[in-house]
Amino acid sequence: MSVAIRVIPCLDVDAGRVVKGVNFADLRDAGDPVELARRYDGAGADELTFLDVTATSGNRETTFEMVARAAEEVFIPLTVGGGVREVADVDRLLRAGADKASINSAAVARPEVIDEITRHFGSQVLVLSLDARRVADGSTPSGFEVTTHGGRRGTGIDAVLWAREAADRGVGEILLNSIDADGTKAGFDLEMIRAVRAAVRVPLIASGGAGKPEDFPPAVQAGADAVLAASIFHFGPVDAIAQVKAAIRAAGFPVR
């Protein structure tokens, strides 16, 4: 693997503040999004992801003003998601200063929107945000189910098959988040990463479960091209990004 592994802090935004919870619940305040973005840029983050965690469930649009402020302050790629439903939403985000848009619930509801967005802007601007959870009852072939609305609603759709369909439709990369592992700090769901990696060729961002620097190399080993986390960066040591990169490098993978 010669392409550098990207380390991406995730800023879950609710009502203009960065929050972090466990399993998408019990949200705790982590600070001002633009301030944190500036801090992470300076600390060596490769990219930043903003997810408006209540935009879809509360039917609110993503805060374009926050994106514009962040884009003025930071000089690494910004991905923004939450409430992205159509071409016009992506257009507004890109004009505000985002480099990429992330889509989740709207694509599950109407997969053709992926084709429409990528036809307009190209695959490189669209990230599929895939919130998946384990199902033990054999209700999906892979044992992983797509969820929507911040992990609150099951869909009955197989997560691996959905990843493949989205890639076929043109998404540029997939942000794979384990709802079960999210916020637990117990490590990534490696089985889930391996299953999706085997099904798609587009870059794969692993998310959900990171608690310490040593949790990251196994995710890369399982097939992730990038690793995304929140708690370890928001509430961990100030040099957490450097520690994560050092751990990945020590495991034999290139980092920037």
Curated annotation (Swiss-Prot):
Q: Which GO terms describe its cellular component?
A: cytoplasm
Q: What is its EC number?
A: 4.3.2.10
Spell out the catalytic residues: D12, D131
Which enzyme type, at the first EC level?
Answer: lyase
Annotated localization: Cytoplasm
Cross-referenced SUPFAM superfamilies: Ribulose-phoshate binding barrel (SSF51366)
Q: Which UniProt keywords apply?
A: Amino-acid biosynthesis, Cytoplasm, Histidine biosynthesis, Lyase
What does it catalyze? 5-[(5-phospho-1-deoxy-D-ribulos-1-ylimino)methylamino]-1-(5-phospho-beta-D-ribosyl)imidazole-4-carboxamide + L-glutamine = D-erythro-1-(imidazol-4-yl)glycerol 3-phosphate + 5-amino-1-(5-phospho-beta-D-ribosyl)imidazole-4-carboxamide + L-glutamate + H(+)
Question: What biological-process terms (Gene Ontology) are attached?
Answer: L-histidine biosynthetic process
In Pfam terms, one family for this protein is His_biosynth
Q: Which domain of life is it from?
A: Bacteria
Q: Which pathway does it operate in?
A: Amino-acid biosynthesis; L-histidine biosynthesis; L-histidine from 5-phospho-alpha-D-ribose 1-diphosphate: step 5/9
GO molecular function terms listed in the Swiss-Prot or TrEMBL record: imidazoleglycerol-phosphate synthase activity; lyase activity
Presence of the UniProt keyword RNA-binding in the record: no
User: Gene3D superfamilies, per this entry?
Assistant: Aldolase class I (3.20.20.70)
Q: Does the keyword Lyase apply?
A: yes
User: What does the record note on quaternary structure?
Assistant: Heterodimer of HisH and HisF.
Q: What family does this chain come from, according to its entry?
A: Belongs to the HisA/HisF family.
Record function comment:
IGPS catalyzes the conversion of PRFAR and glutamine to IGP, AICAR and glutamate. The HisF subunit catalyzes the cyclization activity that produces IGP and AICAR from PRFAR using the ammonia provided by the HisH subunit.
Output this protein's name: Imidazole glycerol phosphate synthase subunit HisF
Organism for this UniProt entry: Renibacterium salmoninarum (strain ATCC 33209 / DSM 20767 / JCM 11484 / NBRC 15589 / NCIMB 2235)
